Each structure stands twice: as C-alpha cells, then as structure tokens.
Amino acid sequence: MRESTWVSLLLLLLLPTPQRGGPQDGRRSPEPEPERGPLQPFDLLYASGVAAYYSGDYERAVRDLEAALSSHRRLRDIRTRCARHCAARRPLAPPGAGPGAELPFFRAVLERARCSRSCQSQRLGGPASRHRVSEDVRSDFQRRVPYNYLQRAYIKLNQLEKAMEAAHTFFMANPEHMEMQQDLEDYKATARVEAPLLDREAKPHLESYNAGVKHYEADDFESAIKYFEQALREYFNEDMECRALCEGPQRFEEYEYLGYKGGLYEAIADHYMQVLVCQHECVRELATRPGRLSPIENFLPLHYDYLQFAYYRVGEYVKALECAKAYLMFHPDNEDVLDNVDFYESLLDDSTDPASIEAREDLTAFVKRHKLEAELIKLAAEGLGFSYAEPNYWISYGGRQDENRVPSGVNMDGAEVHGLSMGKKSPPKIGRDLREGGPLLYENITFVYNSEQLNGTQRVLLDNVLSQEQCRELHSVANGIMLVGDGYRGKTSPHTPNEKFEGATVLKALKFGYEGRVPLKSARLFYDISEKARKIVESYFMLNSTLYFSYTHMVCRTALSGQQDRRNDLSHPIHADNCLLDPEANECWKEPPAYTFRDYSALLYMNDDFDGGEFIFTEMDAKTVTASIKPKCGRMISFSSGGENPHGVKAVTRGQRCAVALWFTLDPLYRELERIQADEVIAILDQEQRGKHGLNINPKDEL
C-alpha cells in the first residue's frame, strides 16, 4: 500500500466520530475537577493493604485497601473528565489539500495530547505514568479482589456491617465463590439482616435497567418509563467513560516477541486500531454483568423495546413511535415492531404527520457512529493484515417474552425464541487427530489411567515420573528460590486469601544456581525434568509436530494458619487453560484474555504431606466432578488445554502442596521466552563443563 494511501486511511481513522444526540449535547465540556492533593497510585496502596492484612495489621489493611479503591475510582474519573474536556477544547481539524495538508490535523493531535497530559498531571498531582499498573492488578480490581481482603479485615475488627457490604460486593462479581456465599449467609444470620445488601461497585445503568424491568412486569408503566429512561442516560454516560478509558497505553504483545518496529503511519494505525476496537466493544462491556462472560442478550435494543410499549400503555403515542423506530435501527426486519409502528401511527392526531416522527435522537448518532467504526475496522483489517470478526452485538433472539409483547389489536403471529449471546464464538473443535497411548519413553514410569478411565478426553495419569530423591531435591530448591506470587509477576494469593501462593521460573532457578545461591545441580534438575515431561506428553499423545513450552513454573500453595475454618472455596477455581469457561452458557470461549495458543497442560507433583489440594476435572458446568486426583511425589497428570478439560484444585487446608506446572503449544510463535533464555544458559553451562573436562595442555607445549 502506497504511503499516500496510508495517510488517507490514517486521517480517516482519526476523524472525530459522531457525538451522541440528546439533551446533554448542549452542555459545555466538563471542566477538570479542583485540586485535591496528589493522588496516590492505587496499586501501591493495594499492595500495602494486602501486606498489612497478612501481617495481621487489620486497621492499616482497611485504611490502605479503602484508599486503593478510592484512588482507583478517582483515577478513572480524572481520565474520563480530561478526555472529554480535551476532546471539546481541542477538536481534531479535518485534513486539507496540497503539500503539508496533514499538518493542521497533526497539530490538533499534538495539542490534544498536550491538553490531556497537562489536565491529568494537574489533577493527579504528578505525571500520569505513576498510575500505570500491571495487568494483574487491573484484573484484581476488575474481579473486585480487594473487597475479599476488606471483608476479612473488617471481620477481624468486629465491623460486621462493613464486612457484609464488602463480602456482598465481592460476591456479585464472583458468584461461583462458594466460601463467600457461606460467609454471607453466616453474616446475615448473625446480624439478622433481611434488607438487600449494598453493592459498592454496582453499575448504575444495570441497576436502573433491572428496576425498570421489575416495574414493567408489575404493570407499573409510569415507573418503568422513569427507570428505563434513567438507564439510557446512565448507559450513554458509561459508554463515554468506557471509550475515554480505551485511549490509554496499548500493548503490542504479538509484535514484542518479533521485535517489530513499524514506520510512522503503521505504528500510529496499529495503536489507534487497538483503541478503536476497544471503544467499539464498549457495547459488550456495558451489557455484561459483573462476574459474567456472556452479555445480556440484545441489551441496548431491549430498552427501546420495553419503552415503546410502556409509552403506548400510558397514552404517549409519539414517544412510543420514536422508541419503536429506535428499535428498528437495530432490527429493521422485526415484524412485530414493524406492526407496532403501523399501529402507533394509526393512533396519532390528524395534525401529526407520521413521517415527521423519527427514531430517538439519542440513539441515531450512537448507531451511526457504531456502524462507521465497524466499517473502519473492517477496512483497516484488510489493509493492516490483522484479523477481526465483527460480533453480532444486537442479537435479536433474546427479546421480551411476555403477554405485552405486542399491543392489543396487532398481529401476534411469529414466536420468538432465545438464542446465542451476542459477540460470542464457540471454540473450534481441536484441529488435529486425537490419539493417545504412545510410548512413555523412560523406564520406571507407571501408567495409571487413560482418558476413558478419567471420564474425559485427552487425559493421562502417570506415576514415578520423579524419584523420591528428585522430589526432595526439587522441594529444597523451591524453598530456596520462590517468591510470594507466581514467579513471573509476584502476585500474592491470586486465587484465595486462605493460602500463600509461591512460584519460580526455570530461568530464575538457573540464575540462582549459577550464582551459588542454590546447588546448580538442583537448579539443572528443574530444567531437565520439565524437558522430560514435555517429551512424555509429546510421545504419549502421539503428536505429529513438535510440542513447545509456552509457560513453565514451580508452584507451592501453603495453607495459612487461622484461616482454614469452614473453608469450602477452591485453591484454584474451575477453569480451562486456553479458553474462557462460561458455566452458565455451558461453553468455553476461545478468545482473549485466555491463552488461546496453549494446546496441552501437565502438572508434576513433588509431595503429598498436606491435606486437601486434590486436582479435579469437571463438566463445563464447573460443578459436576468427573475425576479427582490426589497428588503425590512423581505423579503427573497431563491433558489437552481446551474446554473439554475444565479443572481446578481443592482447598489446601494444611501444609504445603508443591508441583511443577507446565503448559505447551504446537505453535512455535508462542514459545516461552524465558525457556529460550534458559536453553541459552544451559548451553553456556554445558560449554563451561566441557572446558573443565578438556585436556590440560600447557600452551608452551604447542609451540
């Protein structure tokens, strides 16, 4: 593609998108909020709060965790306000013609960037870069993990009411968390509370929508209208916030591996396309309830579907017609609503021209922008060479199912059915022949169970992969090199606060061995046994292509004393390794943030001197256990990584459970970088070893 074409495409992509219509359009851009002092980074406050919790300083834990949550909310608000302020104050100029035609446009871009930096720095009390956090921290706040720590800290401080609020807030985003459910029941019984608990992170537009549905079903149409209209105002406000937050820094993971450095226009277009796709998918974000993977079907259109009939029932036929026409912007061929339009038009005064009644203004600009974005993404995908499948955001199978579906006197033929959730794709079936039963390659390894005996697909259980001596040696290495966390990002207790989670990578083990901090022989054993496991998996499942490491670490889970009473949570919740498990839909969606490139998984256990910690397979409902495996020294479980093998780990209630966890891929593009570096370290060590055993020749003898 010629450079001039790239310029045209880039300028087209960066043109300002249509703004939402409606009563708020005439408002001035939101002025930045007044000074309130430097904002402390929420990730540092969060880390401090968690550390205080584990040290038993519960007052400090509460203080820092509450401050972290407050900082997180304020940061989002500042970013949103600054984005809207600068978009209004520094509009992007359309490109002109002739030499340097793009310069005014890029000047406007630079001015907006300066405005954004100045606004955020002023409001934050320092550079915005201080508030960039890791994906792990961002994920914790999205999953409301801080509230799990908070409720426990409040209980320690005998503040039951606040503990209940925190527990309820966490549970709303983690409905599968059995221990929290039990805690909530116990709290309610103790406090004798019957009133609904407060969800501190409730989404206003979802709350208003739910209230509207309740009033609608109770035939209270005046109240239903009030809440649905409020829900729409809140929805569009949330949409603007979501879009503003998409404008932050982006990551180019696939390019990082290749050392890719694009030219000016390619780099800008690559970055902007990530922003645009993020903004385009805000409709899915806003339709998804906390803790769910599947969005509410047909969510935004349903507001207008409910409203068109509610307005009809209160005699406001013009508004009913506006809402019906708004619904048709999503589903222009919906026969029921087309009939409704004809019916509403027949009810208008003779002085009112039906053709003059148009679809709701608040939606017209929204849909126009959404369609324009879809066209731009498709155009850019063809030119930039990335894949993007436009989801059906407005799936129409999930319409209302009630006796008020169509007004009286209107044809009611044509049944509706519930169907697929919007924007979802079922994972493809495994694109290779499924075989098993190949040779185990090494002596002394004992075959225990195959897939059929484990009630599943592509599963195998083996014993004696490690000797007792090797288990003891690896356990010793683990205690010498492990960090609190997973070994890559140091994430403390990522799955449950009732256990300490520690991990280490192969590369770190070799580094410690090379520095003499652990025996080099023991560090080398970690490397060697992981390679042994890879060869066994590749051979047993009779794979026709090379199996590569995609992720390797040694991991120990330790039960925390004083926190094991009444435990019924899992050490590691039920999940799949290469797709997002959706128990409600009985599906596993092979899409980011899942590690979609993983093909096989293996766990090699080091010990059995602990209570609990059984590895379990389940059905896709994440509840029906199909197999349970008790870890012990030298035992290895391996399986394919997809939705056919949901699995988890039961709570470790006493002692420490250690294992080597391995994930493999058939795609060399996704080879584990640390493993490649570890291979290089091993090559250097082998070369040094060969040098030590070489002939000791006096250089003078060679003369």
UniProtKB/Swiss-Prot annotation:
SMART domains: P4Hc
Binding site for Fe cation: H575, D577, H647
Tissue and organ distribution: Detected in kidney. Detected on kidney tubular cells, pancreas acinar cells, Schwann cells of the peripheral nerve in the pinna, and in tunica adventitia, the smooth muscle layer of the aortic wall (at protein level). Detected in lung, skeletal muscle and kidney. Detected in kidney glomeruli and in prehypertrophic regions of long bone from neonates. In the eye, detected in the epithelial layer of the cornea and at lower levels in the sclera at the posterior end of the eye.
Highest taxon in the source lineage: Eukaryota
Observed phenotype of the null mutant: Contradictory results have been described and may be due to differences in the methods used for gene disruption. No visible phenotype, but decreased 3-hydroxyproline formation in collagen COL4A1 and COL1A1. Full embryonic lethality; the vast majority die before 8.5 dpc. The embryos appear normal, but are surrounded by maternal platelet aggregates and blood clots that form at about 6.5 dpc, resulting in embryonic death. Maternal platelet aggregation is triggered by interaction between maternal Gp6 and embryonic type IV collagen that lacks 3-hydroxyproline.
Domain Fe2OG dioxygenase: 552-666
Signal peptide start-end: 1-21
Annotated compartments: Endoplasmic reticulum; Sarcoplasmic reticulum; Golgi apparatus
Compositional bias (Basic and acidic residues): 25-36
Name of the protein described by the UniProt record: Prolyl 3-hydroxylase 2
